[in-house]
């Protein structure tokens, strides 16, 4: 498993992480098997959020890890906070309470990383800074980052937050590429030229923030998986051809397509199927060619200027 450095820190992480949102729907034995499979494949980074399964996903992780004999020093734990029923909340009180809840559910004394989940337009940067300072000083959080945030929202936080913001977790897949499309269509007037995200890809590279790619196999906003989907015949034919050339599955190739980008991203995969997880892990060391990357991009329906 290839490892990268998270943002500007010295923290070494695998370039594939396990997203734990679906753990809540598994039995303890099933979850224990998934966690052990991930570790055996070199995936020791686990992504959580306080809202996943209403907190049940974090509880299941702790129970499954205990059953599998997995100790705290074997894993890197990330959680996210800021989403509440019907609104977003980056207040100091909520951030700290959320972390306290995650620590209890995960049965740990600290998180390796904490991300602010979705932008809160009522965010007061001073409150975020105070929360981060308290969590860092108490040893409850080692590193910090954001999720789904525009570069200017990151800059607003950085105006008061002392700690480096190491990551931005963003939706990215072969079938969801707005952060890439805009860069190809500078000085154009058609839809792909619109900067929906403030050139977050280039910003992240300049700031040395690690992009964590979520929903790497989805199209739309949780509309479904594009791999082996009859709705995308050209894309899947291309994936099957290139995957066969490399001796990997189309799913692994879809992850490798993201990892080929020189931004040195981390892919968050959510599979709870042990065999599929082992399969996806083969993407870690796979480096496709520039020509193959562009062929896949075009097969997804994208046109180059």
List where the protein language model places each region:
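Active-site mouth loops of central-metabolism enzymes
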Residues: 19-29, 81-93
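N-terminal binding-site loop/beta-alpha segment at the start of enzyme catalytic domains
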Residues: 1-75, 137, 218
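A short, structured active-site edge motif that brings together acidic residues
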Residues: 73-85, 169-174
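Short, acidic/polar
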Residues: 27-38, 90-105, 152-155
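Conserved beta-strand positions
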Residues: 18, 48, 79, 113-116, ...
């Amino acid at each position: 498993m290839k490892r990268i450095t998270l943002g500007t820190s010295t923290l070494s992480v695998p370039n594939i992480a396990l997203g734990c949102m679906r753990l809540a729907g598994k039995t303890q034995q099933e979850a224990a098997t998934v966690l052990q499979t991930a570790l055996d494949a070199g995936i020791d980074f686990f992504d959580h959020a306080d809202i996943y399964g209403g907190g049940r996903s974090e509880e299941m992780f702790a129970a499954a890890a205990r059953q599998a004999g997995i100790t705290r020093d074997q894993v890197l734990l990330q959680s996210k906070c800021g989403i509440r029923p019907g609104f977003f909340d980056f207040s100091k009180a909520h951030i700290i309470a959320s972390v306290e809840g995650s620590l209890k559910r995960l049965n740990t004394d600290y998180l390796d990383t904490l991300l602010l989940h979705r932008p809160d337009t009522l965010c007061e940067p001073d409150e975020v800074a105070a929360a981060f300072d308290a969590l860092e000083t108490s040893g409850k959080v080692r590193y910090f980052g954001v999720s789904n945030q525009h570069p200017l929202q990151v800059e607003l936080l950085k105006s008061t937050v002392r700690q480096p913001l190491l990551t931005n977790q963003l939706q990215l897949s072969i079938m969801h590429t707005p952060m890439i499309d805009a860069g190809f269509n500078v000085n154009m007037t058609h839809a792909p030229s619109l900067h929906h995200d403030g050139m977050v890809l280039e910003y992240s590279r300049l700031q040395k923030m690690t992009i964590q790619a979520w929903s790497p196999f989805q199209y739309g906003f949780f509309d479904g998986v594009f791999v082996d989907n009859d709705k995308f015949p050209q894309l899947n034919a291309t994936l099957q051809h290139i995957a066969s050339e490399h001796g990997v599955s189309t799913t692994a190739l879809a992850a490798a397509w993201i990892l080929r980008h020189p931004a040195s991203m981390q892919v968050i995969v959510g599979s709870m199927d042990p065999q599929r997880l082992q399969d996806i892990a083969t993407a870690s060391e796979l480096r496709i060619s520039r020509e193959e990357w562009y062929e896949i991009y075009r097969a997804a329906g994208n046109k180059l200027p």
